[in-house]
């Protein structure tokens, strides 16, 4: 019993050789003796022991016919500094467990984390069938399934497939490989990065470079963790990596200069990563970096046309001013109208700051159209009202045609009505948008308002009623009225019930201002309602300024002429009235008063004593400012 403890203590302190071990065993010491759960062999074989003696190990094993072979901790042994490959072969031949997992990794993966692993050890273990990845997972492929067992409406050919199935993609391997463990541990002090080891591991399994962990390749981790050597980079590099992955690798490489002192950018690496470039991924990278120095370093190595890259960028899904500036510094030319029109073609490009930058800094091409097509901003379901309104204000001097229509006969105003954007509708109408357009399907701005107000939930319907009043208060033409009446009379709209009647009344009260007889003939059942409306019309006609009644002021005079009336006390008193039917006209009158005050304030701010503006007649100054700012 005493000899058992002596043998254990000698092994625990590594103070033993083969002869002393032999003597203790012959004196009755038992190599299978356990103390605190450890046998002498287990206590002896540890990474703390820098001098594991083969003859001691073999003696402790052979003396008990290798019954204690699995007390030899192979994980600990592989972490020691003096591994003997012949001893490993002997242990394996005697049946030591080599396929176990400890702390989530197998023995090959564990060995890869040591400071200077030997190729022969890798070969011995891998040839025994130990996997290069102990926890491999696979991706999946999405397979669309065409639905045939029920009827559905085919909105678009792209949606013929309405269900999906998933199959395992065995080519998409995911997990931490031996090579991964080798690479990520090389940044530790004293750890060697060997090209021979890397070449051997890749030759053992060619696909090892294509395993990913957390969606990143081994090259990504090499660039991130290690001091880069060209020859190792070339071995790990594969042009078949996705463009997205290559750009992530380039990003982490270029950012490394800010994380690590004395890190110098090797243009060979940059060029290699850009060599298999796709423009889309380069633009994605530029947007993700938001660092002008790094962006410029990429653009300097970009071998294709920077001008073409800029043209593609301004039609990209997200555009940043700093990226445009970097491209300009590298020789690209920004064109005011060409590039702003490209910018608008992408439906989600709506940053007023970008628009303002392009318009202020873009070059003008001689003999070009020099016009802006704002139509692409609008055919979308959701319009970002404040952003688009700011863009319209910026682009106002350059808009070619505010009433341009698309192939369906729809104008910008029509699209804004569909998206129930009140502020945009008011702006468009104030700036000359035609309320009388008719689409190729026969609908009008008034008609679509009525239909949407009838069909939508109450909260949205209220907005459409407000829009309907705004449009009608501008008085449509009789042709537009007749087309609207025909369109709404179509059975497919099913405008029935009290809600439909109230909407029709809103239309009638403005229609009679255009053609009284036609409306009375068309809607004879509403004569009583029309009579009530006439009382308010008569009131507006009775209130006059120098013989001009309020209806004439609101509907028959142009803006500069209206200015002569809006500050008149008679007009301002009338604008304070409350009508039952025509309050929208009162609202429009108050807007005129507010706009006039706004212009007067601007004139006062810039009209200094004796400057040229101050010498002009007030009416002329007001005319200049109204065209410039309203």
Swiss-Prot record:
ANK repeats lie at residues 36-69, 70-100, 103-134, 174-210, 338-367, 408-437. The keyword Repeat applies. The keyword Transport does not apply. SUPFAM superfamilies: Ankyrin repeat. SMART domains: ANK. InterPro entries: Ank_repeat_dom-contain_49, Ankyrin_rpt, Ankyrin_rpt-contain_sf. Keywords: ANK repeat, Early protein, Host-virus interaction, Inhibition of host innate immune response by virus, Repeat, Viral immunoevasion. Pfam families: Ank_3. Induction: Expressed in the early phase of the viral replicative cycle. GO terms for biological process: symbiont-mediated suppression of host innate immune response. Belongs to the orthopoxvirus OPG025 family. Interacts with components of host SCF complex CUL1 and SKP1 and components of the cullin deneddylation/COP9 signalosome complex subunits COPS7A and COPS7B. Plays a role in the inhibition of host immune repsonse by counteracting the action of interferons on early events in the viral replication cycle. This is Ankyrin repeat protein OPG025. It comes from Monkeypox virus.
